Amino acid sequence: MADMDELFGSDGDSDNEQRDSGSGSGSDSDHERPRSASNASGSESAQSDRDHDDDEDEDGGKPSNKELFGDDSEDEHGSQHSGSQHSGSRHSGSRHSGSRHSGSRHSGSQHSGSQSERSGNQSDATMHSDNEHSMSEAHRGEQDDEDDDDRGHRSDVGSPASGAGSRRSDRGSGSPGSEAGSPRSEAGSGHSDPGTPHTDGEGSGKDAHSGDEKWGGDGKSDQSEDEDKQQNSDDERERSDEEGERQKSESIKGSDSEDDFTRKKKKKIASDSDSDSDAETQGGKKPAANDLFGEADDISSDSDAEKPLTPGQPLDADDGMEGDQPEEEPAPETRIEVEIPKVSTDLGSDLYFVKLPNFLSVEPRPFDPQYYEDEFEDEEMLDEEGRTRLKLKVENTIRWRSRRDEEGNEVKESNARIVKWSDGSMSLHLGNEVFDVYKAPLQGDHNHLFIRQGTGLQGQAVFKTKLTFRPHSTDSATHRKMTLSLADRCSKTQKIRILPMAGRDPESQRNEMIKKEEERLRASIRRESQQRRMREKQHQRGLNAGYLEPDRYDEDEEGEESISLAAIKSKYKGGGGLREERARIYSSDSDEGSDEDKAQRLMKAKRLDSDEEGENSGKRKAEEDEESASKKPKKYVISDEEDEDGDGERDGDRERGGDMDGDGDGDMEGDGDVDRDGDMDGDGEGDGEGDGEEDE
């Protein structure tokens, strides 16, 4: 590596070079616009190179404003000095200006590549070490030397001087003293960015011009010394393009957001010291973008590994579940060896499946005349499937038996046979009946023939054909039986039967009997009410003071006092005996007789009433007065004797005449009187006539 003095020079040289670079940059800034305009119109390749390099410069970090434009004083001085000093540099044309700009862009792209890598590592994107500037400037100087040697535009002595001058100018432009103009330059760049209201194509062109103006600081410092020598050439342009493409691959990784981020960081880090910037930038070799950020696969794998298990998340099959679940062992097979003899039967050549109709049946047991029982008409016969069979006698039952032939061999006989005709049809002859037989193949589920062996079944054959039977003609007995059975079946289904009316309706007869009973009850009620009215009339006709006594004649439990009281009343009142006779008529003796006796007594009472009102009423009254006068003291005595002795008994009859003196003569004679025999003395004898006869 070259010596530090050769690379950077002394401080005096750096100051002079700063002035020259400032003037050069000012002059170049004045002439930048016409040259860039000529490049846009004259050379598309130069414009594309600038656009390409400007994009690289925008993606990478930007150097300080002092490196770009220099001091304000230098800009003013350079603008005044540019007209006189570099007036001859305008004749270079678009090709030389394009080459010079490409050189400046090349240095900018190197800076931008290093800045973009440092921005990914979160270091300061705008601060570069002096060593890095010197290395980049030395490299560019060597390239310039090689180009000058090839073209011969400058002398051997001038090329290192110009290279040193460019290095010194670059070093001077990168010094911390030039950082004071960064706010103004950023403001200018901020004005230039939003001031492009054009399409994308136009914007890219204008960005290229603005990029030339921004990033022309390094190139302008070189141009200030190299304009006199006119060292630019086509080879330099090609090399700068190659270097720009190589640097673009590194700087393209930065985004617009990183550019904004680096611009904001520049303001904060502008006040930092050079020692801090040197310590930060001398960190060693810069890592690549993949080393900084890693790949997407690494991020996903690390996040999956560090992710904790959620409480409800089930464990994977590899997380130890193998030991928890033991392998299921297969169940041991149970084999039982059973020896069953094989039964082979002679089934014949053809095997048919038959569903017997209801007019055919088979007797499985051999026929024996000794145990044969004929079928009865009144019994219902059901087959093994529960269907009702027609009650045909011998004609519809297939029977068989075993017998010996003449030679003594056992032969099986049957009452049925199947005849196969020449056309292939078959007929069943059962006794005198003939049935047509039809064959049909079995489709779907096939029926199998089994032989029962103990509790199991042993298969013998599979049925593939079935037979159906039909009566041959309608004149057969089977057909007649079938039609009759159908008629009976239809008649049984009738729910309502009409019966002839053989007698009277029991309901109407019952209603008539009820009506008769009600009439009889009403007649009896009318009769009783009529009798009651007749009695009431009789009571009202003979009502007097004697009937007003309370139940004197109705109660048997009353003592003899009532009788004596009545006798006392009859003593002072006339007609007492008549009332006693009237009382006898309605006495309880009438209850003991029959209905005819009651009717006779009632008629007698009526006659007595009529007689009392007649002619003999006065005579009877006189006789009664005499008898009552003669028998009054006897009545008192008798009543006294009955009270003292207590042997005078009444027989429960309501008799008011009778034997008062105890001589047995109790006749109360009179015309039209009914004599009642009364035993008053208790001897049980009474000669009075109580037979209901009238004494004339």
Curated annotation (Swiss-Prot):
It is found in: Nucleus. Residues 511-537 form a coiled coil. Pfam families: Leo1. Residues 1-336, 526-560, 584-696 are annotated as: Disordered. Transmembrane segments: none annotated. Keywords: Activator, Coiled coil, Nucleus, Transcription, Transcription regulation. One of its GO terms (molecular function) is RNA polymerase II C-terminal domain phosphoserine binding. Residues 60-69, 127-142, 199-262, 526-539, 649-659 have a biased composition (Basic and acidic residues). Residues 36-46, 117-126 have a biased composition (Polar residues). The keyword Zinc does not apply. GO terms for biological process: embryonic cranial skeleton morphogenesis; glial cell development; heart development; melanocyte differentiation; neural crest cell development; positive regulation of transcription elongation by RNA polymerase II; spinal cord oligodendrocyte cell differentiation; transcription elongation by RNA polymerase II. Residues 88-104 have a biased composition (Basic residues). Component of the PAF1 complex (PAF1C) which has multiple functions during transcription by RNA polymerase II. PAF1C associates with RNA polymerase II, is involved in transcriptional elongation and in histone modifications including methylation on histone H3 'Lys-4' (H3K4me3). PAF1C seems to be required for multiple steps in cardiac formation. Involved in heart development and required for differentiation of the atrioventricular boundary. Required for neural crest cell development. PANTHER family: LEO1 PROTEIN (PTHR23146), RNA POLYMERASE-ASSOCIATED PROTEIN LEO1 (PTHR23146:SF0). Component of the PAF1 complex, which at least consists of cdc73, paf1, leo1, ctr9 and rtf1. The PAF1 complex interacts with PHF5A. Interacts with ctr9. Belongs to the LEO1 family. This is RNA polymerase-associated protein LEO1. It comes from Danio rerio (Zebrafish).
